[in-house]
Amino acid sequence: MFFSFVELCFSQDINPREFDYRKADSIALHLPKSKKYSVDDLTILLTKNLNSDIEKYRVIFRWITDNIAYSFSNKTGDVEKVLQKRVAVCMGYAALYQAMCRKAGLECETVQGFAKIATDDIGTKLTKTNHSWNVITISGKSFLVDATWAAGNYNGKFVKDYDESYYLTEPRYLILSHLPEDSKYQFLDTLISTETFIKYPIVYSGLMKNKMNLKFIPEGKLKKELKVQFSTSETISNMYGMFDGDKISTPLEFTSDKNGYQVALKFPFMSKGGYTFFVNGKAVFGFKK
């Protein structure tokens, strides 16, 4: 009873997005990689020296993102098979995270929905769900996580590159790239429709890394003029743009005032392809011409 009371007070007094996860991360990243584990054994090993739920959620997430590679060679949601092969697609990542969380006594659900990853997806009608991610509960509050996108990048070959942006992602950010099939998982006061979602540009994690608060969401299909306006607590030193096929990016002129930053671009001549918008060297939006 005493432990439960301490745990409750501990959880309510912290912001999970600002918590120091170094202990949990160290456990996850230093467990021997060559050894084969069952879901039960691995979960116990990872969580046995952690007292708080917030750290248990994290240690499982970091182990999965550090040890499971994205590969179409294993499309199953069989979690034991994912563990043995160490490869999966989104279904396997989400299923494994859910199974391990539940083994540790943590609340976790898998969310099915639609993800936009390429500029060709802009404006394309959604017919069949193509992505899976998770929702977890900390101190009675729901948080969104995507182990697949956090693990790295895939462009014909998986490149391991952990991205913190997809752990406890704010709903206002995740909805720009992830549309849940069940709207209750949007966790927004105003729900986003399918018609609105498909018009969004492709959104990269630079949006979250730069802590950008958008004045409005630009359309994903480029017209002759593009405007982006946002505020942020970060210092913005540069903005760039690059068309598909360009070898180098083009510096963009922007202005700033007490309300934030603004950039206005004109495209008098456009051919088919894509355009990527960068802020502080990080990709933020992908547009379709």
Functional labels for PLM-detected ranges:
Residues 2, 99, 125-126, 136, ...:
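Sterically constrained small-residue positions within well-ordered secondary structures
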Residues 127, 155-289:
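Alpha-helical and coiled-coil interaction segments, frequently adjacent to or embedded
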Residues 9, 90, 101, 108, ...:
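Generic recognition of cysteine residues
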Residues 95-174:
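Hydrophobic/aromatic-rich core segments of domains that either
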